């Protein structure tokens, strides 16, 4: 049984080796004949692969960021809350403080009275 399959295997391997050698010979011949063009084409190919990797990383990061960020509720949601909780971001508390500070700002009429006195 080994004697029947071994010639087929050896023939198959020799065919593969022949194809491999002819391909390597063609590449070597092309590189030797056109070294500048081959270098330019290889450089362009490498740059395209690098750009493709960068674009894939950026696209993946954006899709992860979009999934992780929660949809923000409308601004009226925060107005209806009687007291801002501690887990809210700080700028919502500052907004409430700024509205309370605006009530202490004197109006134009009060400023005119102060200027005349």
UniProtKB/Swiss-Prot annotation:
Q: Which cysteines are joined by disulfide bonds?
A: none
Q: Which organism is it from?
A: African swine fever virus (strain Badajoz 1971 Vero-adapted)
Inducing factors: Expressed in the late phase of the viral replicative cycle.
Q: Which UniProt keywords apply?
A: Glycoprotein, Host endoplasmic reticulum, Host Golgi apparatus, Host membrane, Host-virus interaction, Inhibition of host innate immune response by virus, Late protein, Membrane, Transmembrane, Transmembrane helix, Viral immunoevasion, Virion
As for subcellular location, the record says: Virion membrane; Host endoplasmic reticulum membrane; Host Golgi apparatus membrane
Asked if the keyword Transmembrane helix belongs to this entry, the reply reads: yes
Q: What is this protein called?
A: Minor capsid protein p17
Organism domain of life: Viruses
């Amino acid at each position: 049984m080994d004697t029947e399959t071994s010639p087929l295997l050896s023939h198959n391997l020799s065919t593969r080796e022949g194809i491999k050698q002819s391909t390597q010979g063609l590449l070597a011949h092309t590189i030797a004949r056109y070294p500048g063009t081959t270098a330019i084409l290889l450089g362009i190919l490498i740059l395209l692969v690098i750009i493709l990797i960068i674009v894939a990383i950026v696209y993946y990061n954006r899709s992860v960021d979009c999934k992780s960020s929660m949809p923000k509720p409308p601004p009226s949601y925060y107005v209806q809350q009687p007291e801002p909780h501690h887990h809210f971001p700080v700028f919502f508390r500052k907004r409430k403080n700024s509205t309370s500070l605006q009530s202490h700002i004197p109006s134009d009429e009060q400023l005119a009275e102060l200027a005349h006195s």
